[in-house]
C-alpha cells in the first residue's frame, strides 16, 4: 500500500516548554488527550499510550509508543489505529521558539494513502487549533 505524510504547522501563543507540557498532560484542556473517553499514557521513551474517543458516532482507539522526548523541543511517538489500517505510523512534533510564541510543526508519516489516512490532516489541525485556542484565551485574559 502506498504511504503518505501529513504536515501541519501552527504558531502557538506560548513558550515551547508550555506547549510541550500541555501535549503530554492528559488533564490539560486543549491537549491532544483531553476529553478522550479513556487514556493511558506513560510519557517516557519506550512508554506506551492508549486513548479512545468518539468521532462520527463511534469510538476510535489509538495506540503508540514514545520514541523520542527532548524537552522542550521534540515529541515523537508511533501511532496505530483502525484509520492507519493497523499499521504503525510515526508522529513527530517539533517546537521552535518564535519570539514569545512557539512554531509547532507536526509531521505524521507512513499513513495509508486512502481517505482514512488523509483525514489525519484535519484531525491534527483540530488538535493544534485547540492548543492554540487554549493559550490564546489565556493571553487575551492576561
Predicted features by range, described:
Residues 1-6, 17-21, 44-59:
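N-terminal short leaders/motifs
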Residues 24-25, 71, 136-137:
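Residues at helix-coil transition
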Residues 109-142:
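A conserved amphipathic terminal alpha-helix motif
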Residues 1-38:
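Hydrophobic ligand-binding cavity/cleft-lining segments
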Residues 31, 39-44, 50, 55-99, ...:
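Hydrophobic-ligand binding "helix-grip"
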Residues 22, 32, 52, 78, ...:
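Residues that scaffold the ATP/ADP-binding catalytic core of kinase and kinase-like folds
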Amino acid at each position: 500500500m502506498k504511504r503518505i505524510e501529513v504536515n501541519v504547522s501552527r504558531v502557538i501563543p506560548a513558550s515551547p516548554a508550555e506547549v510541550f507540557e500541555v501535549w503530554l498532560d492528559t488533564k490539560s484542556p486543549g491537549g491532544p488527550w483531553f476529553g478522550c473517553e479513556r487514556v493511558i499514557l506513560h510519557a517516557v521513551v519506550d512508554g506506551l499510550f492508549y486513548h479512545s474517543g468518539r468521532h462520527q458516532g463511534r469510538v476510535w482507539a489509538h495506540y503508540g509508543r514514545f520514541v523520542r522526548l527532548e524537552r522542550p523541543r521534540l515529541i515523537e511517538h508511533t501511532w496505530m489505529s483502525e484509520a492507519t489500517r493497523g499499521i504503525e505510523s510515526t508522529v513527530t512534533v517539533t517546537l521552535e521558539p518564535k519570539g514569545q510564541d512557539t512554531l509547532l510543526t507536526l509531521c505524521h508519516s507512513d499513513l495509508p494513502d486512502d481517505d482514512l489516512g488523509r483525514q489525519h490532516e484535519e484531525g491534527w489541525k483540530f488538535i493544534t487549533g485547540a492548543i492554540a485556542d487554549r493559550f490564546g484565551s489565556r493571553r487575551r485574559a492576561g
